Regions:
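Phosphate-binding glycine-rich loop
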Residues: 5-52, 66-68, 76-78, 100, ...
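Active-site PLP attachment segment
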Residues: 155-199, 228
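Conserved active-site segment immediately N-terminal to the catalytic lysine
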Residues: 136, 140-171, 187, 213-218
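PLP-dependent aminotransferase-like
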Residues: 43-129, 133-138, 145
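Structural detector of well-ordered beta-strand residues that form the stable sheet scaffold
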Residues: 29, 54, 75, 134-135, ...
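Short, conserved catalytic or interaction motifs in soluble domains
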Residues: 33, 79, 166, 194, ...
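PLP-dependent aminotransferase class I/II
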Residues: 10-18, 25-26, 89, 93, ...
């Protein structure tokens, strides 16, 4: 607050560099939300009318909306019942069908749900076979790793997106970032972030020598900029990122142990990955408890436990139903949704509070 800049100052590139360096990417483009980051990522990859983008139905709506913002069509690939991420098998089947009708997507957006990394090596191999680009939606996954590398390295994707919303692993109040190791994509995202404007002489169009042109709008962009105040907060959060994730894993390990005796399924951990552990989702064994998901959810709420549902399949939202999507489109995602409840997961969750959560779950599961 005592600096000369509230926005468009030195803290933004410093934060971008800190995140990119941590993740092992060459460039970071900070924006005002992960939604904006997904949008500029689609724009940078040339997504537009006539194109298709595929993503997971088990995600927040922004993972799909970014395609629509760009004028493209969106479709969904069902999830793996163990990881809750996009199923590689279903993706391969859908791609083969699309190839037969010349409708392979331009971009696929795998979502690292709850911080658990997708099988990016397999998805990348399919991208090489079928010719699509990849945007990793890692909104839940900063601080996680896949095959020993930080999520965000972009080894298996063109662009990776992080979220810094207040409920995420680190926060800037509101904010997001798109990472890439491609300088052309980075420059395009910088332009789309700020009205499609550039101040770089080498990118400007020729003008009469007696006219002063400090900047030019060379494309249609948005005002998606992050402020210096937000970036300063982000820099302070980055210092504690590994600590936050370590604490989340300790909380998850305690949950794993405490929930063993209850009729629920706890989150699976991939041996190839290290989750950012944004969420801890239990699946109810409904055939054993003889209670509905709503019964359990409402009981926990009544007991003061801050539970949530992640996620209603995107295509079940009324807006998407008006586009023609119907119930049953992704059976695994719908079965998961009917059984899933997210229980409290945050670094300040004490052992005592965790015990209270378990007691409340035990009570809620009983008829």
């Amino acid at each position: 607050m005592r600096s000369d800049f509230l926005t468009q100052g030195p803290k933004v590139p410093a934060f971008e560099q800190a995140v990119a360096s941590y993740a092992g990417a060459s460039y970071g483009v900070a924006v005002n939300s992960a939604t904006s980051a997904l949008h500029i990522a689609c724009r940078a990859l040339g997504v537009g009318p006539g194109d298709a983008v595929w993503t997971s139905p088990n995600t927040f709506v922004a993972s799909a909306n970014c395609a629509l913002y760009s004028g493209a069509e969106v479709d969904f690939v069902d999830i793996d019942p163990r990881t809750y991420n996009m199923s590689v098998d279903r993706l391969a089947e859908k791609l083969e069908q699309a190839k037969a009708t010349n409708s392979v997507p331009k971009v696929v957006i795998p979502v690292h749900f709850a911080g658990q990394p997708c099988d990016m090596a397999a998805i990348h191999a399919l991208s090489q076979q079928y010719g699509f680009q990849i945007i990793e939606d890692a909104s839940h996954a900063i601080g996680g790793r896949y095959k020993g590398e930080p999520i965000g390295s972009c080894r298996y994707s063109a662009i990776t997106v992080f979220s810094f919303h207040p409920v995420k692993i680190i926060t800037t109040g509101e904010g997001g970032m798109a990472l890439t190791s491609d300088p052309v994509l980075a420059e395009r995202m910088v332009q789309f972030r700020s009205h499609g404007i550039t101040s770089k002489p080498e990118l400007m169009h020729p003008r009469p020598v007696d006219e002063i042109w400090n900047y030019q709008q060379i494309d249609l962009g948005n005002n998606y900029r992050m402020t210096d105040m937000q970036s300063a907060l982000g820099l302070s959060q980055m210092v504690r990122l590994d600590e936050f994730v370590t604490v989340r894993h300790a909380i998850a390990a305690r949950y794993d142990e405490l929930l063993k005796a209850l009729p629920v399924t706890t989150p699976w951990r991939s041996p190839d990955g290290y989750s950012g552990m944004h969420l801890y989702v239990i699946r109810l064994k409904l055939d054993e408890i003889h209670r509905t998901q709503r019964d359990v959810y409402e009981s926990l709420r009544e007991q003061g436990v801050g539970v949530n549902l992640h996620y209603i399949p995107v295509y079940r939202q009324p807006y998407y139903e008006r586009m023609g999507f119907k119930a049953g489109y992704c059976p695994e995602a719908e079965q998961y949704y009917r059984e899933a409840i997210s229980i409290p997961m945050y670094p300040g969750l004490t052992t005592e509070l965790q015990g209270q959560v378990i007691d409340a779950i035990d009570k809620a599961l009983k008829p």
